[in-house]
Curated annotation (Swiss-Prot):
GO terms for cellular component: cytosol. Pathway: Pyrimidine metabolism; CTP biosynthesis via de novo pathway; UDP from UMP (UMPK route): step 1/1. ATP binds at K14, L15, S16, G17, G57, R61, T165, Y171, D174. It holds the Pfam family AA_kinase. This is Uridylate kinase. It comes from Psychrobacter arcticus (strain DSM 17307 / VKM B-2377 / 273-4). It comes from the Bacteria. It is found in: Cytoplasm. One of its GO terms (molecular function) is UMP kinase activity. The keyword Secreted does not apply. InterPro entries: AceGlu_kinase-like_sf (IPR036393), Asp/Glu/Uridylate_kinase (IPR001048), Uridylate_kinase (IPR011817), Uridylate_kinase_bac (IPR015963).
Length: 241
């Protein structure tokens, strides 16, 4: 662990469901969950306040059901929101096994399972040293968990929004399909929007641009990558105003 002071005192980490699946097609990879909880515990040890938004694509993918007309878009999105709750429960317990006090806050009221999301309460918990996991997206259909991550990051006044992926940044084309793909070290929000690079959906990018909150895309499987980003070291791709 570095002796340096972290560059960011409060961050919002976006974990996609696909990232939590690791090498599996579906479900939660326990090794990934364990590594991420350890990385977050390291950040807490440095005094960094951590909010997390989790996706649900590892547990539910509604495109096929919607394509075949079996469920409508609104229902499909609601099913996806519930999938994020399951991922959030798993992450909460993984963190609490490391003695990291964690709050699970949902955009949808779910009684005994979570508490309802409130930005004021979330900020208070973060200041008290607790990790906050935000689930159920924005609570509304038609909005992605990327948009939810940017919204929550803005609401909790995070200094940086981090997107954990399976690649080490943003490329001009898919590096898994093109050996000559070029990685960007830095991009402006306008460049991402103009080139349609797929960092996040356009609504999410526009939100961050409007509120001047930088994004960092990094490889969650690379050792110490999350720590390096928070310490201000060169890691992944930075997207800024």
């Amino acid at each position: 662990m570095s002796d340096k002071t972290p560059r960011y005192s409060r961050i919002l980490l976006k974990l996609s469901g696909e990232a939590l699946a690791g090498t599996k097609d579906m479900g939660i990879d326990t090794e990934v969950l364990d590594k991420m909880s350890l990385s977050i515990a390291h950040l807490r040890g440095l005094g960094v306040q951590v909010g997390i938004v989790v996706g649900g694509g590892n547990l539910y993918r509604g495109a096929q059901l919607q394509k075949e007309g079996l469920v409508g878009r609104v229902t499909g999105d609601q099913m996806g929101m519930l999938a994020t709750v399951m991922n959030g429960l798993a992450m909460r317990d993984a963190l609490e096994r490391r003695n990291i006090k964690t709050r699970l806050m949902s955009a949808l009221p779910i009684g005994e399972v979570t508490e309802s999301y409130s930005s004021r309460n979330a900020i208070r918990y973060l200041k008290n040293g607790e990790v906050c996991i935000f689930v159920a997206g924005t609570g509304n259909p038609f909005f992605t968990t990327d948009t939810a991550a940017c919204l929550r990051g803005i609401e909790i006044e995070a200094g940086l929004i981090l997107k954990a992926t399976k690649v080490d940044g943003v490329y001009d084309k898919d590096p898994s399909l093109h050996s000559d793909a070029v990685k960007y070290d830095g991009l402006t929000f306008d460049e991402v929007l103009e080139q349609k690079l797929g960092v996040m959906d356009l609504t999410a990018i526009a939100l961050c641009r409007e509120h001047d909150v930088p994004l960092q895309v990094f490889d969650m499987n690379k050792p110490n990558a999350l720590l390096n980003v928070v310490m201000g070291e060169n890691e992944g791709t930075r997207v800024y105003h």
